[in-house]
Amino acid sequence: MATDRTIWQLSGGPASRSYADVFVRHAIGLLGPGDPGRWHAERSDEDFDGSFVRRFACEMKVGDVVLLRTGLSKIRAVGVVAGDYEYLNQFDDVNGWDLQHARQIRWCELPVEYEFGSSVFGANPPRFSGVGSEEVVDFARRFVVSPPTYWQEAALPALPAEEPMLDEPPEALRNVVAEVNDLYPLLWDRERFGDHPTEDELVAHFVVPLLRALGWPPERISVKWRYIDVAPFTALPRTPENCRLVIEAKRLGAGVEGALEQAKAYVQALGTPRDIVVTDGVRYRLYAAAQDFAPAAYANLVRLKRPALDLFNRLKRP
């Protein structure tokens, strides 16, 4: 057995805001916080909220085994480290997470998540760490030597290209974007602001102003119509036929992608296919009804990139 390989666990993100799919799709392992910049030997652990990034960059070696952890006791995939530490800015916004610290990892995704049955990674496992549980170490060592093992030599996929930043938002949206960027740091500061704003506040202060700036008049923007958080209408009266799309709002920083199923239920109740937007007031992800609700457009108002223009165009009043 490969007893010389260190066994690591790497979090795939919380259930409500997971990024495990990104790891498997791109044969990559990612870690944050990435916005403080590339790690190097002169950087302090304090710059990265602890020693996780330093250990990820320095102690992990090519050939080590990585378990893609989900929750306290499950794993989604087993991987083998295939590359040295890199800082990849194309992963600066993974479902809202800044995960630029990277290593290429060849993953073997399990048919179903493997449940160890107890909190083998600890009661509050860190985002990245070495594995100490004998049960888990034994599982990992046996897995990588058990056939099939061809996945450990598979060609690595090309990494996605970095999306260019948007130098200036469209003129109609400049005030809205500026206000969001001004308020965003404050809303996260519990000492200065207090409790995080509710979904209703985010709708009132961010979502509706964005729609107004995109040309929708107030009488054609409903709030809590048929339980839908926000719905713009192409014409009056407010009927399912005139509903342009369904917007489902979540609290700030929540996993907006996890709200898709709830929004799809609202669309089904309408009886007519409509695109869906899920948002926390800052991040907006659109799912296209014509593509079986596949993700089709995205914008992060505090990290605007050129593809955001597509989302703005889709949200404009026709």
Where are these regions (language model features)?
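Switch/connector loops and helix/strand junctions flanking conserved nucleotide-binding motifs
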Residues: 19, 76-78, 87-90, 113-118, ...
